[in-house]
């Protein structure tokens, strides 16, 4: 399920990075950054269950409702109701709006 989320976010066409950016894209852009952690339940020496929790961060110059809608559409399709808009911030250092959604997924 996590890989499906990654692929769906990449398919939006919004520049994408998993974990962190090595360089920031130039120009007027929307950027999606995905971070996650994994929790497992083990039994009989094997992983029995896995769950992912993470955040999807969208950075933009100005408000672009189409990019916000794309991210929400992907999260709804991949996570069902297991996500929430955690914060909207203005990043003074970069001049970007920063939207952060927190999600949970069952693992494969």
Residue ranges of predicted features:
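Short intrinsically disordered coil segments
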Residues: 45-51, 72-73
């Amino acid at each position: 399920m996590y890989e499906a989320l990654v692929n769906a976010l990449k398919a939006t066409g919004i520049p994408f990075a998993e974990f962190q950016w090595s360089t920031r894209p130039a120009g007027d852009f929307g950027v999606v950054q995905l971070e996650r952690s994994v929790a497992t339940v083990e039994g009989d020496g094997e992983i029995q269950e896995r769950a992912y929790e993470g955040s999807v961060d969208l950075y933009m110059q100005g408000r672009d409702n189409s990019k916000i809608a794309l991210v929400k559409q992907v999260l709804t399709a991949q996570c069902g109701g297991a996500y929430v808009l955690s914060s909207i911030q203005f990043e003074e250092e970069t001049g970007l709006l920063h939207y952060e959604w927190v999600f949970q997924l069952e693992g494969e």
